[in-house]
């Protein structure tokens, strides 16, 4: 999914052979939408249109399958690009289905068709109650057919993990995850990919290892070709985010904190400012790690953040409120609660954390803070009700990996029930948690 590097490679191929139709096709393809960035900025749309024209111009030199891919890609773009890309993306997926029917023995064609279908519902292949969304069964069937043709096809294994990870049976992709571990050892994102299935199947230590390897690869690549730019920054951050989360779930607090701090430090300030609506929530992650391990003094020692990070500024108050409540400093906790409510109101509605809005995540934090504070004040039932509300809101968040809330609310609710000697209720909460986080 390193589209920038792919474009550079295709451009070099086109420089060496200006009449190579597939080099121009590749540039046009890589400028298009994908599940992690379902947009086409105007400069990318213009370049895609130009390169598509060159691919069509030189298509006579291409094979029949390549000509079919070029013809299908022509359905994906228009000049000028419309405000609503939906009809173009659907037309491209439909065209790729026909190409796959014509060339059912070509695994690349099948993988590109599956991706075109996934792009119609990015990160939304399964409903909250575990039912496949429209098109999901076709995606899975296509990828399984591709893997019968080429079991080690990198893209098909990659997409298969994404296709089933949010399903009720993520273990379907365990074999694909294991194949991915050493399939492309120089590509950090693909080294990391098995952890998407590991953490859904309770293989937490394997998830730690996969992401440790991925982080080592991304650092080695930075030494070879320079620091990452653009969206690649966030792919690298994602590896460390996933590593920290898996470390949290295995009780490795120091390891989690090491990598979450490194993740934050490696995002340049200028990139934070330019991409604040995407990056803001990443910067808040150290608070969740510290809360997980009850490191209250460290939470309270962290400084405030710039105004261009409104979510992190708000989350800081929530974390401080929980820390003060845990230390029995109720008045200070109330002050932070008031500050959190005021700061959360300033978070723009379009700020996001992965597949969720920052405001939706703030709502989980609001109920967590209220629950912890009420519980510490001795209002046990009220506190438990707020924690249960936090659980409900966490469950309603859209699927993402790592989860948008990496401090499982059921763990806090279960601990509170244990302290209240409501052991049967606590046991049920923990059993429910194991369904979500085995």
What label would you give each PLM region?
Residues 4-41, 102-111, 272-273, 343-345, ...:
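Short, charge-rich amphipathic alpha-helical segments embedded
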Residues 19-34, 60-82, 105-127, 150-164, ...:
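Amphipathic alpha-helical repeat scaffolds of TPR domains
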Residues 13-16, 100-102, 147-149, 179-186, ...:
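Solenoid-like repeat scaffolds
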């Amino acid at each position: 999914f390193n589209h920038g590097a792919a474009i550079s490679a295709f451009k070099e191929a086109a420089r060496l052979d200006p009449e190579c139709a597939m080099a121009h096709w590749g540039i046009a393809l890589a400028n298009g939408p994908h599940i992690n960035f379902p947009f086409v900025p105007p400069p990318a749309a213009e370049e895609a249109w130009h390169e598509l024209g060159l691919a069509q111009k030189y298509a006579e030199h291409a094979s029949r399958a390549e000509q079919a891919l070029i013809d299908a890609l022509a359905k994906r773009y228009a000049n000028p690009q419309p405000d609503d890309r939906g009809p173009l993306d659907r037309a491209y997926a439909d065209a790729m289905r026909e190409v796959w029917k014509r060339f059912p023995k070509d695994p690349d064609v099948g993988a590109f068709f599956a991706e075109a279908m996934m792009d119609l519902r990015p990160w939304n292949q399964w409903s909250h109650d575990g039912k496949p969304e429209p098109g999901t069964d076709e995606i899975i069937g296509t990828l399984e057919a591709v893997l019968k043709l080429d079991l080690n096809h990198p893209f098909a294994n990659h997409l298969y993990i994404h296709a089933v990870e949010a399903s009720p049976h993520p273990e379907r992709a365990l074999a694909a995850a294991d194949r991915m571990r050493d399939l492309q050892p120089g590509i950090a994102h693909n080294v990391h990919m098995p952890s998407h299935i590991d953490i859904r199947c309770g293989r937490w230590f394997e998830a730690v290892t996969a992401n440790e390897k991925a982080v080592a690869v991304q650092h080695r690549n930075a030494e070879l070709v320079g620091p990452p730019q653009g969206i690649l920054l966030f792919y690298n951050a994602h590896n460390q985010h996933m590593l920290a989360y898996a470390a949290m779930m295995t009780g490795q607090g120091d390891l989690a904190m090491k990598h979450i701090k490194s993740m934050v430090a490696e995002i340049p300030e200028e990139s934070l400012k330019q991409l604040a609506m995407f990056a803001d929530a990443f910067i808040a992650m150290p608070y969740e790690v510290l809360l997980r391990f009850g490191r209250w003094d460290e939470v309270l020692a962290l400084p405030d953040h710039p105004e261009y990070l409104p979510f992190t500024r708000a989350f800081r108050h929530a974390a401080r409120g929980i820390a003060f409540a845990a230390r029995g400093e109720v008045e200070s906790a109330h002050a932070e609660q008031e500050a959190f409510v005021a700061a959360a109101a300033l978070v723009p509605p379009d700020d996001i954390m992965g597949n969720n809005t920052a405001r939706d995540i703030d709502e989980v934090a609001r109920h967590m803070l209220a629950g912890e504070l009420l519980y510490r004040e001795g209002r046990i039932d009220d506190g438990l009700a707020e924690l249960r509300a936090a659980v409900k809101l966490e469950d309603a968040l859209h699927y993402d990996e790592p989860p948008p809330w990496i401090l499982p609310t059921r763990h806090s609710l279960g601990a509170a029930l244990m302290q209240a000697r409501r052991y049967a209720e606590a046991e049920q909460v923990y059993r429910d948690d194991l369904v979500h986080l085995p």
